[in-house]
């Protein structure tokens, strides 16, 4: 059945990311892409970003709107070890020991100096995800993380889902779009069995206010059945639990349906 939901702490070394974006024409860091990707991993409990924010005023509004705590790290002519790195590492270790329910740490940086921190978190049984730019992320850090996501791959396509009919009521279209986005997210996570409970959990991560009743369905199974009738997904029933599993997009012949 669906696995337990992970609890995430997301720690962003913005100074490092800014260096990665330096010189890239017409490209600006989009923190919402990161958060949208990470809600597919679990529930985000802590969100912090570290930088001398007086140098990045253009980004502050977007980070505030995303409810990310801005950790102000003034440079003050400091030389040697980056003070933002030190503060991020200290906060990570503090969270590791004081918030035992946080089982996954996301270090958004490509800096090899975080490799010892990653090792310490893993020693304490934490799952560590790294995220950074392809051309500025250290192989040492990449190889030490349990998994590493490149920023450039955040919108990697996973196939073309069917189009939703435009003439459907808005609430139904919204529900179907959220369903498709969630199935795409789970496929991207290489989930082999897409249980209905797993899909609903992902939908609520993406939109915490989601309720099938609001969209006109008595149960979540009713929503899935309607999506199948509309040619958006294919379902089968698990013989042990008698619950739905999504086995793909689009329609299939009646023969073998839900077998």
Give a label for each model feature.
Residues 1-97, 117-122, 127:
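Domain-level signal for Mg2+-assisted phosphodiester chemistry and nucleotide/NA-binding surfaces
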Residues 70, 105, 128, 148-149:
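Short, well-ordered beta-strand core segments
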Residues 100:
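Basic nucleic-acid-binding interfaces
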